[in-house]
Regions:
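Alpha/beta-hydrolase-fold serine-hydrolase catalytic core, especially in secreted/extracellular enzymes
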Residues: 7, 289-290, 298-302, 306-419
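Short beta-strand element of the alpha/beta-hydrolase
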Residues: 94-104
Length: 419
């Protein structure tokens, strides 16, 4: 009896250990094998001064000219007409440099960017702000190639304006709009310069994993929660039409072969403010472009002088428009990488807390649908197991009951048989 008991106990222990190992391995394989990590390769700031000055070019500065606004209509080519606002310097000798504005996710109207566009026009730069189409633009779906085509039509209109030098016409883009901008630069060779402000730089889910980590950390979430929230970004959201999570930023980033100005606000926790600038510099250098300037301003994601995201009525960060104008006028006057009197990287000291991971592959649970299915299946399986257990118990009880009745009937039959 003791031997049987020991064997049974040993068998149960071995089975339990094997099942624990199997389920632990399965759980490990289900989870993504990466974590967001603190960012440690900090960028070197040469000066706290955000001023940008060409060493040899004589350029106009902000406020030099009065400005004039003209309302335009831009045809997208598929029957839609978009409003646009053109701002020009009055009395500036032509042909002039010009800049097309590309919206990020928080703006879409022709009236947006008004303070920046008007300031640039007062420094002799013609600016055009077209509206962005919002049809078929949702939290889940964004058609970046379509936007690039439409902004390309606006660029053609700007380049064709009297008083504009098409060879000195470039683009200004913010946030999500910088992805659109790089698609545009990959399709066209006639873009004279690119200003990229608050750029995600990395692929969608890489940047979003970093941003989620920063947000949850700021909210005071425990470290395991911070890690697991970031890992949700590794799931496949395509069934929910969240295709922009897989936007291939690397594919287009290499097209930045023209002079580039990179701007970030040091209060911006949603963007890779150090890693992104370093990535743009490195990628541009590989393409033979060393004329990349980086500036950090004491501002938020919208380059406003405050920490609130989308807080209305905040003024622009100090020195922001002056830096834009001096840089655009400098590069369009022919200033090369070695022609600046000011450092390549300067401004307020940034601090990027988390790195944008470049490895965001999922585990066995590769999609939100599978995860949702498992979450639903768990309780369902428990209920089914309970029902099965009850059924087996009832079945066993019935078997015992029937066996007992047969036994009683047999005994009675034996006693009833004559000897």
């Amino acid at each position: 009896m003791k031997r049987i008991s020991v064997r049974r106990v040993a068998s149960v222990i071995v089975t339990a250990m094997a099942m624990t190992l199997v389920f632990a391995t399965l759980g490990w394989a289900m989870m993504p094998q990466w974590n967001t990590r603190p960012y440690t390769k900090h960028i070197v700031i040469a000066s706290a001064d955000t001023t940008i000055t060409p060493a040899h070019a004589n350029i106009p500065h902000e406020g030099r000219y009065r400005t004039r606004e003209t309302r335009l209509s831009i045809k997208t080519g598929d029957g839609v007409t978009l409003p646009a606002v053109l701002r020009e310097p009055v009395g500036a000798p032509g042909p002039r440099p010009a800049c097309l504005f590309i919206h990020g996710s928080g703006t879409s109207g022709a009236e947006d960017f008004g303070d920046i566009a008007n300031a640039m026009a007062s420094a002799g730069i013609v600016t055009l702000v077209p509206a962005k189409r919002n049809d078929n633009y949702t939290v889940l779906h964004r058609d970046y190639p379509r936007f690039a085509r439409e902004y390309g039509r606006s660029l053609d209109v700007l380049r064709g304006r009297i008083g504009v030098d098409p060879a000195k016409t470039g683009i200004y883009a913010e946030s999500e709009g910088t992805w659109i901008a790089t698609i545009l630069t990959s399709k066209r060779q006639d873009i004279a310069f690119a200003v990229l402000t608050s750029a995600p730089v990395f692929n969608g889910r890489e940047q979003m994993a970093m941003a989620v980590s920063a947000y949850t950390h700021e909210a005071g979430a425990p470290k395991p929660v911070v890690k697991d929230m970031a890992k949700l970004m590794s799931l496949d959201y395509a069934p929910f039409d969240l295709a922009y999570a897989d936007f291939d930023a690397d594919r287009y980033l290499k097209s930045l072969t023209m002079p580039v100005l990179v701007n970030y606000g040091t209060y911006d926790t949603a963007m890779p403010i150090e890693q992104g600038a370093q990535r743009i510099i490195a990628t541009a250098n590989k393409s033979g472009n060393e004329n990349v300037t980086v500036r950090y301003f004491a501002g938020n994601h919208q380059m406003r002088a405050g920490e609130g995201l989308f807080t209305p009525n905040l003024p622009l960060a100090e020195g922001y428009t002056q830096a834009l104008e001096n840089w655009v006028n400098g590069v369009t006057a022919g200033t090369k990488a070695d022609g600046w009197a000011t450092p390549q990287v300067a401004g307020a000291t940034p601090h990027q807390r988390f790195a944008a991971s470049q490895r965001t592959r999922s585990g066995i649970v590769g999609s939100l649908g599978v995860l949702a299915g498992l979450m639903v299946a768990g309780p369902v399986l428990i209920v089914m197991a309970a029902i099965l257990g009850i059924g087996l118990t009832v079945f066993s009880w019935l078997q015992t009951l029937l066996a007992g009745r047969r036994s009683v009937a047999t005994v009675r039959a034996v006693h009833a048989t004559p000897s």
